[in-house]
Amino acid sequence: MIHSKKLTLGICLVLLIILIGGCVIMTKTNGRNAQIKENFNKTLSVYLTKNLDDFYDKEGFRDQEFDKRDKGTWIIYSEMVIEPKGKNMESRGMVLYINRNTRTTKGNFIVTEITEDSKGYSRSKEKKYPVKMENNRIIPTKPIPDDKLKKEIENFKFFVQYGNFKDFKDYKNGDISYNPNVPSYSAKYQLNNDDYNVQQLRKRYHIPTKQAPELKLKGSGNLKGSSVGSKDLEFTFVENQEENIYFSDSVEFTPSEDDKS
């Protein structure tokens, strides 16, 4: 009888330890997930910035990687990638380097086409068109004989100029993950076609699918903040071996490098 009571007590003790351990792990996971979401929320607060000139006066996260005299450079990038079934993959996007020291901005409009040769090897062909930004206007710095392409470049808008994540804190049922070895972290949310940002993308791009996208937020570096690492977002409409349709975007604040182009 005594042996039976001891055995029962031992089993209860083991179960209690497992339960407490599980609660501790769950609490840590929930706390980290909340920290990851808050980290992304701070990153997304830069959306909406309609006037690109505002970045000259916008301060970003600074750490020991910055020289005290360096005001930093904002790097903004938007790209639409479309690969219909049976066709080549094509991406069209732009990158700008907004230097807060010199208050000048330069970058490139980039068109990339990925083809597959007869042996099944992928080939990438990329064309860059240098640009500058003045008074919130994109200006090609070299002659462009193709009027349609020139107009596309001059009328280009970055996602940060029309995207808005004011309701991000209300996003539910996200798939949040963390890899401490890199470190890297991510969050995924299934959107619907009534989402404001999805509507804005469909308004500006010919997206050949009615499928609603998944929003993927990806980051690397210290969760508490670091100029080393990256954060970017992606709206994935279709992703498989035959067809890919997605929009990617990033806004980063980095130490200035005068040779960026």
Swiss-Prot record:
Pfam families listed in its UniProt record: DUF576
The UniProt entry, under InterPro entries, shows: Csa (IPR007595), Csa_sf (IPR038641)
- Which residues are annotated with the lipid modification N-palmitoyl cysteine? 23
State the signal peptide span: 1-22
Is this entry keyworded Signal? yes
State where the protein is found: Cell membrane
Q: Which GO terms describe its cellular component?
A: plasma membrane
Q: Which family does it belong to?
A: Belongs to the staphylococcal tandem lipoprotein family.
Q: What is this protein called?
A: Uncharacterized lipoprotein SAOUHSC_02788
